[in-house]
Amino acid sequence: MLISETTPKEYVSYLEKRNYDYFVVGDEHVDLRQALELFSVKFKAKKVLTDTGRILGNLLLEQGLVDEVNLLVHPVIVGEKSYNVFGNISQNLKLKLRKQEKLDKGLVWLVYKVTN
C-alpha cells in the first residue's frame, strides 16, 4: 500500500490493525517516482506492470515514468458508453511500434516504446 505523509492517521491505524504493509512515499500526495525507486531498491524490481485502468496509467505516463505501452485492440466498436483511455494526459506522447501480434478471436496486441 502506498500512502503519503498526509494520509489520515485513522487510515494508517486501519492498515496497521490488519497487518497490511504500507510505504510512505511523498508529502501531500503519493510520489510515484519515489515509489518506483523504492520498488527498485527494496524489491529489486526492474519492471512494473499496471493494468488498473486509466487513472494510474495516465499519471505514470504524464510524469514520464512509462517506457512501454501495450494495447489490446478488440474487434468491437463501442458506442456512446465509451471513454477516452488517455483523456487525462495533457501532452502528446510519441510512440514507436515495437511489436504487433494477431491473437485469437480477432484481437491484436500492439507494443509501443514511448520515445519522448
How should these model regions be labeled?
Residues 1-116:
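Enzymes that bind and transform nitrogen-containing heteroaromatic metabolites
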